[in-house]
Design a protein with these regions (language model features):
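P-loop NTP-binding module
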Residues: 1-176
Length: 176
């Protein structure tokens, strides 16, 4: 496969835990996860069920070529894109037992790492400006098979970074 797949496999091997039979038990008890991760803390709630429905609509049963990349976006701050992204990624990794990489592309206000009780000094923006290699930036979350790439350090030109050729190459690498 590609470099991205190899990097994800390496991150998973470093902290791999055998898949658990129940969703709740696949998250370590000592994790400092945000309580808004309803897909983890309220696995039988109506909200979590809506994330399951969304997941099923994206990954329809019998689909020959399921999507490799899903983007969650909004026009304004505070509309819930991080809430949707972290819960959808959690449901995918927990219930489909599929590897998932959640990339925080909000370079103005990166927040994904905080949802998982993690910190990252560098991330996507640092990769895009050439100050870090992607394999050094992937972070394993407390949720089995879910890794994240944080937004990184705040840069003055987030629109240009997201539209850069390096970002396009990263997206192509993620698809492979």
């Amino acid at each position: 496969m590609g470099k991205m797949f190899d990097a994800l496999q390496k991150v998973q091997r470093e902290k791999y835990v055998e898949p658990a039979d129940e969703v709740q038990s696949s998250v370590p008890e000592d994790s400092v996860l945000d309580d808004k991760l309803v897909s983890v803390f309220a696995s039988s709630s109506m909200i979590t069920e809506q994330f399951r429905r969304l997941r099923t609509r994206i990954f329809r049963p019998g689909m020959e070529n399921p999507p490799r990349i899903i983007m969650v976006a909004s026009a304004m701050q505070g509309e819930g894109k991080s809430f949707v992204a972290v819960n959808l990624a959690s449901i995918i990794s927990l219930e489909l037992h599929s590897y998932a990489l959640l990339v925080d592309c909000d370079l103005r206000n990166p927040s994904v790492t905080r949802w998982f009780g993690l910190q990252a000094k560098k991330g996507l923006s640092d990769y895009l400006i050439g100050e870090a290699e992607i394999q050094d930036l992937l972070i394993k979350t407390p949720i089995d098979k879910l890794s994240i790439l944080s937004g990184g350090s705040i840069q003055g030109n987030p629109v240009e970074l997201i539209g850069s050729n390096k970002m396009k190459t990263l997206i192509q690498d993620l698809k492979s």
